[in-house]
Regions:
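Acidic, low-complexity cytosolic segments
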Residues: 1-30, 37-159
């Protein structure tokens, strides 16, 4: 897995606008931008319903497991993963090698409509992440080995 790029405020603002538009058009409840190592990058919607940090980690792990399953059947990539519940469903869509879009929506909405509205959002977010990567390739963050209990290491000043 590669490194997630350092995002600037304008990147976050654009991602926020894209996720809000996705929620408005699709009528989904929550949209999460998740780094594939399991870290929540950004969220929009009604996060009071769930612990989005834990949800991001579990969603990433589930998606990564499905990707491993894909390799076992000689499939190069499963681009999305759908889980249907009694009240809510989730759709996880691959954005790029480092990130996922996770959408939580009521079951009366169809997965097809979620995929339809997610597609332009995924393209916009992928483009912005790519721009951020090009802007500062040496400023990327490798979150895969980060210890989430050691917050000091994340914010330690580099000399």
């Amino acid at each position: 897995m590669g490194q997630f790029p350092q995002l600037q405020q304008e990147d976050i603002d654009l991602i926020d606008a894209v996720l809000r538009e996705l929620l408005r058009k699709s009528e989904a409840n929550i949209a999460l931008l998740v780094e594939k190592a399991g870290y929540l990058i950004h969220q929009c919607g009604n996060p009071e319903q769930i612990d989005t940090t834990t949800f991001a980690t579990l969603g990433s792990n589930a998606y990564n497991a499905v990707q491993f399953m894909a390799s076992l059947v000689n499939e190069s990539n499963f681009s999305s993963m759908y889980q249907q519940g009694e009240s809510y469903s989730t759709l996880m869509v691959n954005i790029d090698e480092n990130s996922l879009l996770v959408i939580v929506f009521p079951t009366h909405l169809t997965v097809g409509s979620m995929k339809y509205y997610a597609a332009p959002a995924v393209r916009s977010i992928a483009e912005r992440i790519n721009e951020a990567s090009q802007r500062g390739p040496g400023a990327a963050l490798d979150l895969s080995d980060l210890d989430p209990t050691d917050v000091q290491a994340l914010f330690h000043r580099k000399d």
